[in-house]
Amino acid sequence: MDGVHLGENLEDKDTEFTWEVKANDRTYHKQFKKKGFLCWRQKKYKSNAIHTAKYNIFSFLPLNLYEQFHRMSNLYFLFIIILQGIPEISTLPWFTLFAPLVCLFVIRATRDLVDDIGRHRSDKIINNRPCQILRGKSFLWKKWKNLCVGDVVCLSKDSIVPADLLLLASTEPSSLCYVETADIDGETNLKFRQALTVTHHELTSPKKMASFQGTVTCEEPNSRMHHFVGSLEWNSRKYPLDIGNLLLRGCKIRNTDTCYGLVIYAGLDTKIMKNCGKIHLKRTKLDLMMNKLVALIFLSLVIASLLLTVGFTFMVKQFKAKHYYMSPTHGRSDAMESFFIFWGFLILLSVMVPMAMFIIAEFIYLGNSIFINWDLNMYYEPLDMPAKARSTSLNDQLGQVQYIFSDKTGTLTQNIMTFKKCCINGCIYDSDDEHGTLRKRNPYAWNPFADGKLQFYNKELESLVQGRQDRAVQEFWRLLAICHTVMVQEKDNQLLYQAASPDEEALVTAARNFGYVFLSRTQDTITLVELGEERVYQVLAMMDFNSVRKRMSVLVRNPEGSICLYTKGADTVILERLRSKGVMEATTEEVLAAFAEQTLRTLCLAYKDVEEDAYKEWEPEHQEAALLLQNRAQALHQVYNKMEQNLQLLGATAIEDKLQDGVPETIKCLKKGNIKIWVLTGDKPETAVNIGFACQLLSENMIILEDKDINQVLERYWEDNVHQKAFKMMTHHNMALVINGEFLDQLLLSLRKEPRALVQNAVVDEVAQEPVVSALDFLQKRRISQMWRNAGPSLGTSHSADSKIRESPEVQRERAFVDLASKCQAVICCRVTPKQKALVVALVKKYQQVVTLAIGDGANDVNMIKTADIGVGLAGQEGMQAVQNSDYVLAQFCYLQRLLLVHGRWSYMRVCKFLRYFFYKTVASMMAQIWFSLVNGFSAQPLYEGWFLALFNLLYSTLPVLYIGLFEQDVTAEKSLKMPELYMAGQKGELFNYSIFMQAITHGTITSMINFFVTVMVSSDMSKAGSSHDYQSLGVLVAISSLLSVTLEVMLVVKYWTLLFVGAVVLSLSSYVLMTSLTQSLWMYRISPKTFPFLFADYNVLFEPCSLLLIVLNVALNVLPMLALRTIHRTVLKQRPKGEEEAPSEEVAVEPAMRHLRRGIPARRSSYAFSHREGYANLITQGTILRRQTHVDDSDGGTVCESLNPPEEDIPLQNKDSVFNPRKISILAKKRRHFFGKGSQEEVHPNTSSQTMEKQPTIHRDSETQKLPTTTSATSGKLLPSASEDEAFYSVASQYTLASQPKHTDVHSSFWKSPLWRDSASSSPSQLEVPRKQS
């Protein structure tokens, strides 16, 4: 399946540790050979040169011919040409097929050669990149292709790693090396690699590196991107190696001046190249159908030839019986005569397979590719990047795409994080400078440390900061300046932040602009400049992010000696750790929901003052847990959790992860065209889901299924396999899947032969000591069980029970998963490797039999791009590997809309019309050969002149059909984009299929019968009246009638008339007149009477009025009935009742049975991409990661993060069995918890809200004190209740009702829309309006 074998090649099989690399010893590696093709032996250690091209000078001709003859039509034509070379059976001149076939081969070979030259150029650019290689005792600049295994390489900042290297040393402390892996796994965050301590201390100069003679023994080259095991033997000692010591090819060196590495894998042996599948010849659905149709036509011609041969045999027997005296003149037996006449008929009818159609199709594909290249609407001016069709044979398939598989990083997003809003003490602060007008006047002029690039500015908030009266505001910005792992450097008297995440950098920069400047840090201190005053905080403990905690905390002692804990994290873990939950906390939670509705990435901030005695009691426990050798992570987690209780909420931040321009609109439009979009990313689930909401791939009313839920669905799928209905419930609901790479391994590998240890080894980033919790625990079991009760017995397989039994367990599992996923509106696959991306695409292709498109911009997308039917590479993002292996190149994701809905749909429609008309006109003209055989004694005598047979499809009727293939339009480009529903015709194959093919054949057969038999009958009467009636006149009359009939037919089917089309028709008919005048001239007859036998045949016929009238009669009989039928058909369609025409489908008409599963209130999504493994806090506290103050860098950074739900011990006992158990309901699939407090233990009745609606309090900022007033009931003094809309599922009442927020609280209040909550008792809305994203 296009380079991906299901399951078996998900990860490479366990390999022996037989790969030995000796430093600085090329001779050692050259002696090793491995078995190659047949008896050839090749080098075991490959060079670093890569070759993505298919051909070279010697292999081009044989390989290209081999690919050409994969087409059934070419084999057929070659076979007929061979037969034509036998004089005894040849019935047509040799040039009728030989010249067109040669022309076809030359055109296709030229196209393939041009495409491959482009690949050679791309390979040359990469292979000739420079790098420094150790030669002797110094480093010399060499090309990448000259790099060999065992070489020592020197890399500088911002350079790309040329091969898989073992990090030996770097200029950073402890030989750390920061790399960006965006071109490998799609993540723009910074990851660090570290050299062994022994190499860090010993290899300190080029001279010592030249004397380095260590030997690395490791696993054979494989595709496991996150796994590496080996050992270094040096000076009679062995040192263990893992993936943390390896720099992978394609990584970019960041924040590191210089590093040194030993080449372990080179060229095609590198992990990124192992993840790139082989180049396969992609064939369109129409191309594959054409192979079948050619075989069908050939079979039909064989049958027709057999029947005509039978007629010939019967006729010969009758003739010999009647004229027995002529028998001695026949030297051959009847059987021999029949044998020769059969092949004669086969050659005669070979013109029924139109070779010219394949030639013209090449020009059509080329022309449509040029139109894509010329489309200025897909030209990206900032990069001077037009769209480019690198493949010219897939244009029609662009109009049949049903699944799009998209990368996230760099494809959907720009990877630009912007601080957009914040909420402090329950008050929302938006930016006063949305359009950048204030930044021109430098509103932060009072702050010398301010970063002018920050787009967020709020004058009121600035006044609060400078007033120093509101502690919540001060602690808010102080927390952002302290609680992080950002590194700081100074360059040209400017502070440069090197963050592990763009999120963190945005937060710290925002604090910096508001006067709380992170200045520097040491192993146990952090220095801030707070409103011009320098303050040093002692770091007592740094509680880092991991995959379970979903939060980060820093315990510090301020200069006054007080201890304070600062915590930031996901709202689901922060809110449940608050000391109390009052109105301000409730307001903040409502604001979080509003931010989430605007697809902003939110983060909660909280703090608490810690008593000295409490710290002294906690610190020994912390030290003891930190010194454990076993279960250290679990012990630290428990200690951290003990400290992170009774917090005081400060507020929340909102960060925008910028999408590329037009992404939401593009996805919305494509979904209207019935195109399903799957996101396959190596990034974290939280990040991917946030982007899913931002780009409108996911919506708030979707039912989102994750790993555990899918397993339950699939189990029921297998149990109920006796049912014939396939996922009926899924068609009525808006559902989505969010799954991770580990789940894919478990799902698709659990029943295969590979050991499970292989799957476990593939995910080495996981913290083994952490509690095992699903990364996305979206839905609780109650929802799933209720789903099955509603679904009943309707959920089954689409295949019969018998076929299901015959399938292997792994095939059943794969089919069940694909069937489930295909019923969902969206699928997001997170943490997937490049090979897993290709596997998902291959699974859909195998079980759904649909056209797939993959789009990406990095090397991690190459395998997916190659596996899909159509590969689209985005240029200018993460290198050129995706572009080099793609079929089409775009600069922006939004251009995909025009590529598919305009160029793709047009190309498909044009090719379909072209094929239908070409088959029709071929049969309409050439079927007369069969009818002529019926009246000429089955003699295999051709009816037409040989030149007419050779030039009819190649010249006489070519230009009109070429116009259809290049310029035909049913609607304009603008209407194609406005009506994406038109695209569904291509997905269903409505414009050309076997039914339409048979219609074209039937129509052509009727046309040929009219042209031939009417001509024969009328000519008989004409001969009785004294007009000439001979064989050549009959052939000319039928030929002219056929030519005019098919020309008028194309004039009827063309919808887009231009002067160019009129010129094409005139030129085609003129070419017939000119060529016929030449081939039937006396001059050509004298040269070769055998080749030009029709002397003045057209002249003799056309100068007879009866012949002209006969031609008009034939054309009228062919055209007028079809014109009448089309007119009647269009009239009936126009008069069809509107209700009948727009009747909804069964899927749309059916009311969903599970409304309570929908999320009526938007869930919050955390702004932080939580770490998939431990963060960098331990390195900071150890001093390992800290930089020298003199070091300067200006590079960007990123992070490695992931989010998991809190462990069981973090959940309050009263909530463990509740529907609000956070382990059961994730931030993506749950309603917000309405019980807010421990403050009131009294029962709140639902009718309270209806009694007090008239006196709802107002939540606002007091202009003087800036405090949030207490909100109580006017009648009872209790907090006002509110209930959720979804009472069928959530029945816990709220403790309060939010009132309106004054207009002055948000400078963009005009953009605020309807409230998120409504009172359950009275349907009147609450008056708190929350801002939505500006349109």
From Swiss-Prot:
GO terms for biological process: binding of sperm to zona pellucida; establishment of localization in cell; phospholipid translocation. This is Phospholipid-transporting ATPase IK. It is a multi-pass membrane protein. InterPro entries: ATPase_P-typ_cyto_dom_N, ATPase_P-typ_P_site, ATPase_P-typ_TM_dom_sf, ATPase_P-typ_transduc_dom_A_sf, HAD-like_sf, HAD_sf, P-type_ATPase_IV, P-type_ATPase_N. It catalyses: ATP + H2O + phospholipidSide 1 = ADP + phosphate + phospholipidSide 2; a 1,2-diacyl-sn-glycero-3-phospho-L-serine(out) + ATP + H2O = a 1,2-diacyl-sn-glycero-3-phospho-L-serine(in) + ADP + phosphate + H(+). Expressed in testis, specifically in spermatids within seminiferous tubules (at protein level). NCBIfam families: ATPase-Plipid, ATPase_P-type. Its main location: membrane. Its EC number is 7.6.2.1. PANTHER family: PHOSPHOLIPID-TRANSPORTING ATPASE IK (PTHR24092:SF78), PROBABLE PHOSPHOLIPID-TRANSPORTING ATPASE (PTHR24092). Disruption phenotype: Disrupted normal fertilization by sperm; sensitivity to sperm concentration and the time required to fertilize an egg is increased; the number of spermatozoa bound to zona pellucida is decreased.
